[in-house]
Curated annotation (Swiss-Prot):
It is found in: Cytoplasm, Cytoskeleton. GO terms for molecular function: calcium ion binding; calcium-dependent phospholipid binding; phosphatidylserine binding. Keywords: Annexin, Cytoplasm, Cytoskeleton, Microtubule, Repeat. PROSITE patterns: ANNEXIN_2. GO terms for cellular component: cytoplasm; microtubule; plasma membrane. GO terms for biological process: cytoskeleton organization. It comes from Giardia intestinalis. Belongs to the annexin family. Giardin subunit alpha subfamily. InterPro entries: Alpha_giardin, Annexin_repeat, Annexin_sf. Annexin repeats lie at residues 3-72, 74-146, 153-223, 226-294. This is Giardin subunit alpha-4. It comes from the Eukaryota.
């Protein structure tokens, strides 16, 4: 961190007091989640209030305020609380998929610890009990949350096994392969699949599955290939809706922009990230999203 924690805390405090959204966004976007987690307690110690609470008091409730509040909440606490919200009552599947699949391994471990502290339940067991079984997305999530990956060293046979599972709608095999593959080996499996079939894996999945099952499997594939690729996929879905999916893009941006800086390049598969953000979201929010995703 180029500036000291106390300096950043002071700069953020001044920006919040002044109601300067542009400055707040610039400061927030300059630091990753691990760095922000060091700034949060310093801010609290200096000003007697967490930055998230200071932001809530300074701004009207809305998507921008929620996005910035999320960004200035401990990453483990935030993910744990959002997962809990997504699985209580009717399951918010898309939100759960984003929170579970698009998560760095170290962040997942920290989230599990925090979840137990907050709710007295073991996170993986809680998810397994709540989501049930019987669909592709359920099978994938059940395996994914265990974070038990290993090298199989059988690229061609794995690519063929995935093809056969797709052709026969064997979603248990599909979910298991995605949930247990090591990222660099998965990229080779995906390349072998495309070489053999002439079709990229994401297109093959899209030809077989729809709605949340399609989203789950394609998101997992992209995440294993590169977090930026997964971010581009999520952003493309947010921008595909006529008015834009405000809640989803704000939530995902606040949590993952620093891990997915290749998003703007991967998004070229769907068009221009900057143009789509401007088209789908109101200007007041769009300008902040552009800063986080490093596009103009």
């Amino acid at each position: 961190m180029s500036a000291t924690v106390s300096t950043v805390s002071a700069d953020l405090h001044k920006a919040i007091d002044a109601g300067d959204e542009d400055k707040i966004t610039k400061i927030t976007a300059s630091y990753g989640s691990e760095q922000r987690d060091k700034i949060i307690p310093a801010y609290h110690a200096n000003y007697g209030i967490p930055p998230s609470e200071a932001i809530r008091k300074a701004f009207k409730t809305g998507f921008y305020e929620t996005m910035i509040v999320h960004a200035w909440t401990s990453r483990f606490e935030l993910r744990a609380k959002l997962i809990h919200e997504s699985i209580k009552g009717k399951i918010d599947v898309i939100t759960l998929l984003d929170l579970v699949i698009a998560c760095m391994p170290d962040d997942w471990y920290g989230t599990k610890v925090c979840y137990t502290k907050l709710y007295g339940r073991e996170l993986v067991r809680e998810i397994d009990e709540v989501i049930g079984v019987g669909t592709p997305w359920q099978s994938l999530v059940s395996g994914w949350v265990k974070h038990d990956r290993k090298y199989r060293k059988s690229i061609k046979s794995d690519a063929e096994a995935f093809r056969m599972a797709l052709d026969s709608d064997n979603y248990e095999v599909l979910g298991s392969m995605l949930a247990t593959s090591v990222p660099d080996e998965w990229m080779r499996i995906a390349a072998a699949y495309e070489e053999t079939t002439g079709m990229p894996i994401d297109q093959a999945i899209a030809s077989r599955y729809v709605k949340v099952d399609q989203t789950a499997l394609i998101l997992a594939h992209h995440w294993l290939c590169d977090p930026g690729q997964a971010a581009a996929y999520i952003c493309s879905q947010c921008c595909a809706e006529r008015k834009g999916n405000y809640a989803r893009i704000c939530r995902f941006t606040s949590m993952m922009y620093d891990h997915c800086l290749k998003c703007k390049y991967a998004y070229r598969a769907y068009g221009s990230l900057a143009m789509d953000i401007r088209k789908c979201f109101e200007p007041k929010l769009a300008k902040h999203l552009l800063v986080f995703w490093r596009v103009e």
